[in-house]
Each structure stands twice: as structure tokens, then as C-alpha cells.
Amino acid sequence: PARRFFHILETQGAEPRLFSTPKQPVSDADHAIGIHVASLVRDGGTLQIGIGSLGDAVTAALVMRHEAPDVFAETLRRLCHGEIPQGRETQPFETGLYAASEMFVDGFMELYRHGILKRKAGDGAVLHAGFFLGTEAFYSFLRELPDKERDLFSMRGISFVNELFGEEAQKRADRADARFVNTAMMATLLGETI
């Protein structure tokens, strides 16, 4: 809302285009990882995904699980050589997911559009993030959201997203059954990712 700003410049030509990211192709390996990850995400849980092909693959797999659970389960079964491991999830999302992520990316938009990103935190937000980065379509989605829906996406300081301090009890409750999905450049012998 305009009341949150000191100055607003409204004139043609004063609206530079936001930097948008290209969509990278999603490999077969990314899709396979995405299916496995989606089976580990609990209904009513919390999700963090990053930008790039792996985040896109996880998003696609979660949508498949929600909208075509039989196809999802069969795909997972085949990836697991005939038997789905115990404890894996294959059912649609009833309660839905909440997201806590430094970066608000296209994948969260898709999960919201498909009725998956819908579990509200204590403050009513379905997502807390520190910044956003995405495609032109993602930016259009954000611009065109009605105010009431826009309020579901709460942009906060990075420290709010990354730390429990300050509102620890509420953040722990909000971030139940969290799954954090990222890629790394390398892993050390002790398991640290860089």
C-alpha cells in the first residue's frame, strides 16, 4: 500500500524492468530427486526451496502429488524399484504447506496457485521470505495480486526467516515438519555443504 512509502514516483518511463531470471531446463535427475523430495514433505508441514531447476522439479512433483496422486505414487514406486519406502507421503495436501525461505521464488507462486501453499502461520501469512526473484510471469503475479491475497506473502528481514530468536515458540509452531531443499557447489568429507 502507498502509505508504507515516503515518496512514490508515478510517471511513464520511471518504471524500470525488474531483473528476471531465466528458467533452466529441468533434467531427468532433477525430476527424480523432485519426486523423492515431494514424498518426504508432510501435509501441514513447512517448505523451503531455492531457485533453479531442482526447485522447479520439487514444485512440479508436489503439484503432481496433489493433483494426480495415483500417477505420483506409481512414479515413486518405479523410482524405488517396485516398493514405496515406509513413511513416504503420496496423498494430496488437505491442510497444505507453509513456506519460510530467504528467497520467494516462482515455485511458491505455483504451489499457491495449485492450492498447496495455504497453511497459515500465526500471523496469517502462508509465506515468510526476505526477498523475491523470478521470471516476468512471477513479477506480474505479484503485481496483480489483490491486497488481501498479497498480505498472505509476508516479506521480512532475513534474520526473521533464518533465526528462531525473538518469537521462538511461535516460529517453532509455524515451522512444523520443515523440509529445506537446496543445491550446493560441493560437500566436504564431514558433510558440510558449500
Residue ranges and their predicted role:
Residues 1-194:
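Conserved alpha/beta enzyme-core scaffold
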